[in-house]
Swiss-Prot record:
Cell location: Secreted
Organism: Pseudoferania polylepis
InterPro entries: Elafin-like_sf, WAP_dom
Protein name in the entry: Waprin-Enh1
Family: Belongs to the venom waprin family.
Lineage: Eukaryota, Metazoa, Chordata, Craniata, Vertebrata
All residue ranges annotated as the WAP domain in the record: 25-72, 74-118
KW Chloroplast (keyword) present: no
Keyword terms: Antibiotic, Antimicrobial, Disulfide bond, Repeat, Secreted, Signal
GO molecular function ontology, one term from the record: peptidase inhibitor activity
Amino acid sequence: MKTLTGLLLVGLLALWIGLPSTSSKILFGCGISPGNPFPCSLPGLTGNRCRRDYDCPQTLRCCNFRCSRSCRIPPVLPWSCPRNPFKCTIPGIDRCRYDYDCPGRQRCCYYSCSRICK
């Protein structure tokens, strides 16, 4: 049993050593967008205002910016979701959660009180 535990710990250590460090990277997690002009050496130090896009209102996205995550306006690209003209008080039924839930090159967009593939 001790041998198995030791091998498991050595294996995990080997995987951890092989992973790239995120502290030296410039973080900006809003899909394809310009890089974060503020490199962060201590990610998450200032506290996150969101964890995922669902935590943000309307069409804002949860992005890495400076040293924390916050709701930000995503860049408008030709294949981006259109702005949602509706202000919803009661959420609808989502038909997707992420872009990979949609067929082909469609995106999972928040539109008319729910998320749909467009």
